[in-house]
From Swiss-Prot:
It is an enzyme of class 3 (hydrolase). Keywords: Endoplasmic reticulum, Glycoprotein, Hydrolase, Membrane, Protein transport, Transmembrane, Transmembrane helix, Transport. Pfam families: PGAP1 (PF07819), PGAP1_2nd (PF25141), PGAP1_TMD (PF25140). Coiled coil: none annotated. Residues 72-83 have a biased composition (Low complexity). Glycans are attached at N66, N824. It is a multi-pass membrane protein. This is GPI inositol-deacylase. Its main location: endoplasmic reticulum. It comes from Aspergillus oryzae (strain ATCC 42149 / RIB 40). The chain crosses the membrane at residues 121-141, 744-764, 790-810, 867-887, 914-934, 964-984, 1001-1021, 1033-1053, 1056-1076. The active site is at S308.
Length: 1102
């Protein structure tokens, strides 16, 4: 006979239609015996299973498994129990004055058969939705795996590393001496050192590894620094006299700590960095450890090089209280997520990021340099590009933090002579890249200054020369810029430009007439040429060498395949005509002694012929594409500007078709440069025909740049072709939809942790609505089907409209804000958090991603549902096997069921108190949450086994309820797992100091109490008053928050679910008549005998 935990269903047409989808099971007999409310309450709390057996008259008679006496339910007319049966005196009534529970037994027969369903079946609608979601997810993952990110052309470095631990940097200098270590790198056979003298004679450089990174990752950079100084620099007297010395590479061993997941760990590392910097500088004051020239000033600053989160640690160090002013003035980071934290699962990491970024923005917003503590600091952020699948390269942008006068972001594919995209690890060892880094550092150091580096403006000029292509508007030039001109001069050759005094083959000079005057020397310019031919004229040409402005381009020949092939690059010059206003002649001097195979192309071109601006929208580009034909009389360089192509979410296909090609031999094959102004990303394609275009432009969730106009230029394509060939060129650009799907993985990977919680919350909301109205707790699959037919589509539609409106509002200028008068005029008008909501997109075009993510989330939820059901089924089978093997169930009594037993209330209270006490002192609350998840899994397994054996409504209700709570907690578990992983790592490295955070007992107490309440097998009471809307509102609020803020502030999802758990605990306590006197009885041990909620079946003693 099926029994309900509380109440009976109410006649409701809507719920009746829901229950009537499944035909009722045939009854085994004509008679159904109903029990009164007290008997049903006892069944709900003790979990006692009832087996129907027929007597001689054919009537159904219940018998408890653990009782030897037959029990017949009293009739409804009975008002009291017999004197020898006092079960009513020891039972706690489910109903309460605050949360009355419906107790009418009417209409039970109509709903009961349809509710005893297996959790495995799902509706056709749910299955179809999951199928479509699986197709979408398959193509997204396939596109991500097959996307075109460029080949791996990195050379393998050669090194002979030696790491010397700084044992003197002990607890006297830092409290982290037992956790972290400081090392010095020495290259074997190159760097002289001994145990007594470390051989420090250069500029100190400190390397900071990233999240779970090793200090040994520095060996490729440090080895190149040692060998370059030994082979090149030390033989150059001019550079030595200019203050260039070797680089002494130090490195910190963070013990592979995970700063990306824990804000306090990030702060601890930054504190240790400042203490290490102070210790490193002190080493140069000790003549026993240093071989520096005593006439040189002692170093007062250290250059920081950080990889991944090491770059964030470097920036954080400058905001700490133990930071020595001006002890750091140069920071170079590689694949560092400056703009946003990689994951937002920890509140500390989100708040720490905000404090760091606010400090840097405020510092650079000061009017006067004396008020800016970072005035002398230069920050260079280098990103690997699309090959980096660990940290989105969009996050490496510092355009929202640092003005162009103090730093910039550049991609490795932009750096001259590198031209390679790199993954998260290869950026630390790639041979071409490490050479560029080290050479740039050697140019910025100056040991004649106490800061060990050149002034900030000079450092920025050097970094731009080494890291930018030279074609950017911010690139440094020897010839001063005069402004934008309508004409330009370009020169391309496959030879190298000679500097003044070099003995090469080609020299380019910009000359002006320089009449000599008496007493005036002719050495003011790099070269003076006399073309008078022996006549009496005194007019000469005074010239400047253009080699410093030379730009390296990848060599593009008919046999070229990749831009990073180890061949001699092309040399290129480009000037606006106004930049040459002071000169009258361009002299190209062929200095070769014998004929050489090569070419030189130079021309003056008009911007109207060389610049094409495509004025079309993204919709037109998506529907029809873009087609451009270049005429045969085109300039050597043609620039195609497409402002509509600015999003990081779309990929494109570019095709270049040459007409009438092959009639004349070309001097070089077409060369294409794809570029974005902010951040500085350039990609080169040699011998170009077909190009897969992907870029890092406007990306989701990125804060706006300090200069809003920086992102308005879109993408530009520079095409170099041989103008001597009489052939037209057709260029076509189309959106690559299949390739664009792969871009969603890196930009929206955390969405798949937030959006599924929206679906789970709406499903559980429907489950509680049906339960409060009918008394039946439907399965998760039924709830999902019901949500798909009602609330879920409406919520996704509302979120889509919200995403479109948010993207539209971000495009309005500050003056269009109707509330702009409320803002203080001294405050920055830029809202750096405006892209934190929902999709984080600044383009209303992508509103359709909301229903796509919702669709995928439904499929993911159903798949995880079946994975969890399979796990519970497996554990249930093992649990049942052990119970039967132990002899608890005999074969002849397999129809009889055991009682859902649990520990006494006193023991459960003590266990919970101990766990909470540990949370407040030693362990983080994330550990207690994991314990709660395990306990809830065990409860779900036991409930599933009892439901399968009992086949009663009460047991099915509780099994479905326990499973849904477990599924909800399972989706919250990843948010807590990362901090738990950091804590476990600290234990492994024998760091037992408790976290200074994550010990808030209130953050876990509701979960612990809810899980403990469910271990008794007690079904949560129904709420039939208006308080039932509170449950619905809490679930709905969790769903909305998951969609709007779930990506940027995922850690709050735990706290919102914690509030929900507190409400459910409140329902339990309200129905059980919780009071302080009862709590006292539990502590004294009396409740263990009287409270049936503990799971024990109490018998009356004779």
């Amino acid at each position: 006979m099926h029994r309900r935990s509380s109440g009976s269903p109410v006649e409701d047409d809507a719920e009746d239609s829901l229950s009537s989808r499944i035909p009722p099971e045939p009854s085994n007999g004509p008679n159904v015996v109903d029990t009164p409310e007290k008997s049903r309450s006892q069944v709900a709390r003790t979990g006692t299973s009832i087996d129907l057996r027929r007597d001689a008259t054919g009537a159904s008679t219940p018998r408890s498994r653990n009782s030897s006496m037959w029990r017949t339910p009293p009739s409804s007319s009975m008002t009291s129990n017999p004197p020898d049966c006092k079960s009513s005196s020891v039972m706690m009534p489910l109903a309460s004055q605050r949360l009355p529970i419906e107790a009418s037994p009417d209409h039970q027969r109509r709903y009961r058969p349809s509710r005893l369903r297996s959790p495995w079946p799902c509706s056709i609608l749910t299955a179809f939705t999951t199928l479509v979601a699986s197709i979408f997810l398959f193509f997204i993952l396939r596109s991500f795996a097959l996307r075109q990110t460029g080949g791996d052309g990195c050379g393998v470095p050669v090194m002979s590393p030696t790491f010397i631990r700084m044992v003197g940097f002990d607890t006297e200098h830092t409290r982290f001496a037992s956790k972290y270590n400081l090392y010095l790198y020495r290259e074997g056979g190159v760097d002289p050192y001994s145990q007594e003298n470390l051989g420090l004679n250069g500029v100190p450089v400190l390397f900071l590894p990233g999240n779970a990174g090793s200090y040994r990752q520095v060996r490729s950079l440090a080895a190149e620094a040692s060998r370059h100084y030994y082979d090149v620099v030390r033989h150059d007297e001019d550079r030595l006299n200019a203050g260039t010395r070797s680089l002494d590479f130090f490195m910190i061993d963070f013990n592979e700590d995970m700063a990306a997941f824990h804000g306090q760990t990030l702060l601890d590392q930054a504190e240790y960095v400042n203490e290490a910097v102070a210790y490193i500088l002190s080493l140069y004051h000790d003549p026993r450890r240093s071989r520096r020239d005593p006439e040189l000033p002692d170093p007062s600053a250290v250059v920081l090089v950080g990889h991944s989160m090491g770059g964030i640690v470097a920036r954080t160090a400058l905001t700490m209280t133990n930071y020595q002013a001006n002890s750091v003035n140069t920071i170079v980071t590689m694949s560092a997520p400056h703009a946003k934290p990689p994951v937002s699962f920890d509140s500390d990491i989100v708040q720490t990021y905000k404090q760091i970024n606010d400090y840097w923005r405020e510092a650079y917003s000061q009017t006067w340099a004396n008020d800016n503590p970072l005035w002398h600091v230069t920050l260079i952020s280098i990103a690997g590009g699309s090959r980096d699948t660990v940290v989105p390269s969009d996050y490496a942008s510092i355009s929202s933090l640092v003005p162009e006068t103090h730093g910039f972001t550049v991609f490795t594919s932009t750096i001259p002579d590198v031209w390679i995209g790199m993954d998260h690890l290869s950026i630390t060892w790639c041979d071409q890249f490490r050479k560029a880094i080290i050479k740039s550092l050697f140019e910025v150091v100056d040991v004649r200054r106490a800061t060990q580096t050149k002034p900030r403006a000079e450092r920025m000029r050097i970094f731009k020369k080494w890291y930018l292509t030279g074609m950017e508007t911010v690139a440094e030039r020897t010839l001063p810029r005069k402004g934008v001109s309508g004409k330009k001069f370009t020169l391309l050759t496959n030879q190298q430009f000679d500097k003044s005094g070099d003995h090469g083959s080609l020299e380019v000079l910009f000359c002006s007439v320089f009449p000599l005057q008496n007493g005036k020397p002719a050495t003011a310019f790099s070269m003076n040429m006399d073309f008078s031919g022996g006549t009496s004229g005194s007019t000469r040409l005074a010239c400047k060498n253009a080699a410093e402005d030379g730009i390296h381009l990848p060599a593009s020949t008919p046999s070229s395949k990749r831009p990073y092939d180890r061949v001699q690059p092309f040399s290129y010059l480009q000037y606006d005509l106004e930049d040459l206003a002071e000169h009258q002649f361009v002299a190209v001097v062929d200095k070769a002694n014998s004929p050489t195979k090569g070419f030189v192309l130079a021309e003056f071109s008009d911007s109207s012929d060389s610049v094409i601006r495509a004025r079309l929208g993204l919709g037109s580009l998506l529907s029809a594409g873009l087609k451009v034909r270049l005429p045969a009389n085109r300039p050597m360089l043609t620039e195609l500007q497409i402002p509509a192509v600015h999003s990081s979410l779309l990929d494109y296909r570019l095709k270049i078709i040459r007409k009438n090609h092959g009639q004349q031999q070309e001097l070089f094959a077409p060369l294409l440069r794809q570029s974005v102004a902010d951040p500085h990303e350039s990609k080169f394609f040699v011998n170009v025909k077909n190009v897969n275009v992907n870029l890092h432009g406007l990306a989701p969730f990125m804060p706006p740049p300090l200069r809003e106009q920086a992102t308005l230029g879109g993408v530009s394509f520079h095409l170099w072709t041989d103008p001597s060939c009489d052939s037209t060129i057709d260029i076509s650009l189309s959106v690559d939809i299949a390739g664009s799907l792969g871009e969603l993985v890196m930009r929206y990977r955390t969405v798949f942790a937030a959006f599924p919680l929206l679906v789970v919350a709406l499903v559980m909301r429907k489950q509680f609505q049906v339960y409060d109205e009918t008394g039946y707790f439907i399965t998760f699959a039924e709830g999902l089907d019901s949500a798909l037919r009602s609330s879920l589509p409406m919520l996704l539609l509302a979120m889509s409209l919200l995403a479109s409106s948010l993207a539209t509002s971000t495009k309005l200028p500050p003056t269009d804000d109707p509330f702009h008068w409320r803002t203080n005029s001294t405050e920055s008008p830029i809202d750096f958090t405006k892209n934190d909501l929902l999709l984080g997109s600044q383009d209303a075009f992508f509103w359709f991603l909301v229903p796509i993510f919702g669709l995928i989330s439904v499929g993911v939820c159903l798949v995880i549902n079946y994975v969890a059901l399979a796990l519970i089924f497996l554990l249930t089978s093992i649990y049942g096997f052990l119970r039967s093997k132990s002899g608890y169930i005999r074969r002849d009594e397999k129809g009889n069921l055991p009682i859902f037993s649990s520990a006494s209330p006193r023991r459960r209270l003590v266990n919970s108190a101990i766990l909470l006490a540990l949370v407040s002192t030693v362990i983080p609350y994330q550990f207690a949450y994991m314990v709660a998840c395990i306990v809830q899994l065990a409860t779900s397994v036991r409930a599933s086994w009892h439901a399968k054996e009992a086949k009663s409504t009460t047991h099915y209700n509780f099994a479905n309820f326990a499973y849904s709570i477990f599924l909800l907690m399972l989706w919250i578990l990843p948010i807590n797992a990362l901090v738990l992983l950091v804590w476990a790592h600290n234990l492994v490295v024998h760091w037992f100091m408790p976290f200074s955070s994550h010990h808030n007992v209130l953050s876990i107490m509701p979960f612990v109490l809810l899980v403990e309440a469910m271990t008794t097998g007690t079904m949560i009471p129904r709420v039939t008053t208006r308080f039932k809307h509170v449950t619905s509102m809490l679930f709905f609020f969790i769903a909305i928050y998951s969609a709007i803020y779930g990506v940027s502030y995922a850690y709050l999802l735990h706290h919102l679910t914690n509030i929900l758990a507190a409400w459910l605990v409140g329902i339990y306590f309200s129905a059980s008549g919780f009071s302080l006197s009862r709590l006292w009885r539990v502590l004294e041990g009396d409740e263990a005998v009287q409270n049936p909620a503990s799971g024990s079946h109490t018998k009356k003693k004779p």
